[in-house]
Design a protein with these regions (language model features):
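C-terminal lobe and adjacent flexible extensions of AdoMet/dcAdoMet transferase-like proteins
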Residues: 72-157
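Conserved catalytic/acceptor-binding region of the Class I
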Residues: 5-71, 81-94
């Protein structure tokens, strides 16, 4: 809210929770550690915008599916995009050949004629910035922000 002028338009896109669900599922068969970062769902994004005081939010989603010849090709593209696992709870050691082979075998169950699918859920949102001093909402209630300089000092005396 500090960077956007009052009644300015906020536009953004991000990934949704269905992004790379096939990869997440495949690695879940091979390893208990998470391998795909989680993303906020469309309702959570809308709620966050409203709670931050933005008005008239519009949130939409679409899915795009790309296909790869094999799991290493997908992993190579993810690394090239910089989309590696950023989770703190991720495994810090190498995945290892046996785990990677188990994930690859599990991923093969999703194979289509075009190759291994990778789903990308794209969530797009827009909302209008609130007026200066508009309340921030949390848990359905307005939070009041009062600058310290505006708090009167009562002196005993």
């Amino acid at each position: 809210r500090r960077a956007l002028k009052p009644q300015g338009l906020l536009l953004f896109s991000t990934f949704g929770p269905e992004t790379l669900w096939e990869l997440r599922s495949a690695f879940a068969h091979a390893d208990a550690a998470p391998h795909v970062s989680p993303f906020v769902d469309i309702a959570g994004i809308g709620d966050a915008l409203v709670n931050a005081g933005f008005f008239q939010p519009v949130v939409d989603r679409e899915e795009e599916v790309t296909h790869y010849p094999n799991l290493p090709a997908l992993m190579h593209e993810l690394r090239a995009l910089g989309a590696t696992n950023a989770l703190r709870s991720r495994r810090t050691t190498l995945t290892g050949r046996s785990r990677f082979a188990a994930a690859s075998t599990a991923y093969e169950t999703h194979r289509a004629a075009a190759g291994l699918p990778a789903t990308w859920e794209i969530v797009s949102a827009m909302a209008w910035a609130p007026e200066p001093g508009a309340p921030i909402r949390e848990g359905g209630a307005d939070l009041v922000a009062v600058p310290v300089s505006k708090i009167p000092i009562r002196r005993r005396g």
